[in-house]
Amino acid sequence: MAKRSKAYQQAAELVDRARLYAPLEAAELAKKTAKVKMDPTVEVAMRLGVDPRKADQMVRGTVNLPHGTGKTARVIVFAVGDKAAEAEAAGADAVGSEDLIERIQGGWLDFDAAIATPDQMAKVGKIARVLGPRGLMPNPKTGTVTPNVTKAVADIKGGKINFRVDKQANLHIVIGKASFDTDKLVENYAAALDEILRAKPSTSKGRYLKKVTFTTTMGPGIPVDPNRTRNLLEPAQV
């Protein structure tokens, strides 16, 4: 196991691994344990009580974070003609069709989200094996296969993000930056949590939220009480 830095060890000492923190306390602690010289991302990791190998237990969806992620997403759009012009006017970072597909086949993946008009999906299917595992494949369920490219680009640039459980039943979602006010981090978490709870498969049995952890880039994990799904701006009850 790689040796942790002194800064990491000092930050880890602030976290009581034997307790479950209220979301408000976890957000405050995430800010305290973040590296001062940078503005790291604050992320939530969840372990869900689902079996992603079963098609009816796949958890995926979108959430509009009320305070955004602190980062302007890089968005590409697969479109031609008037729709391509609309995407460019909306602020898409790259727009194209076959040329964009060839660029991605060549190894370019410098973007955070991909949108496609319905007529482009047959072509985009050529790179499904590249985009799919990275959570970048356009999908009607997440609003990224749509003729309304203007709205789709604006939504993602404004803080709309996708979430999807992985093969190990883990789910990761960004809720902001360490520089955010604590309340804003918690409000973003609340918005994400609501959507993730809403996406619970009807076939999922037992506890749905098994484990929740807050963490910052290169920071220690902070265990959060998975039972706290309401009144998230309140401290832990003693």
Swiss-Prot record:
Record has Ribosomal protein as a keyword: yes
SUPFAM superfamilies for this protein: Ribosomal protein L1
UniProt keyword annotation of Ribosomal protein present: yes
Gene Ontology molecular function: rRNA binding; structural constituent of ribosome; tRNA binding
GO CC field: large ribosomal subunit
A GO BP annotation: regulation of translation
Keywords for this protein: Repressor, Ribonucleoprotein, Ribosomal protein, RNA-binding, rRNA-binding, Translation regulation, tRNA-binding
HAMAP family listed in its UniProt record: Ribosomal_uL1_B (MF_01318_B)
Function of the protein: Binds directly to 23S rRNA. The L1 stalk is quite mobile in the ribosome, and is involved in E site tRNA release. Protein L1 is also a translational repressor protein, it controls the translation of the L11 operon by binding to its mRNA.
Similarity comment: Belongs to the universal ribosomal protein uL1 family.
Quaternary structure and partners: Part of the 50S ribosomal subunit.
Entry protein name: Large ribosomal subunit protein uL1
Organism for this UniProt entry: Saccharopolyspora erythraea (strain ATCC 11635 / DSM 40517 / JCM 4748 / NBRC 13426 / NCIMB 8594 / NRRL 2338)
Gene name linked to the record: rplA
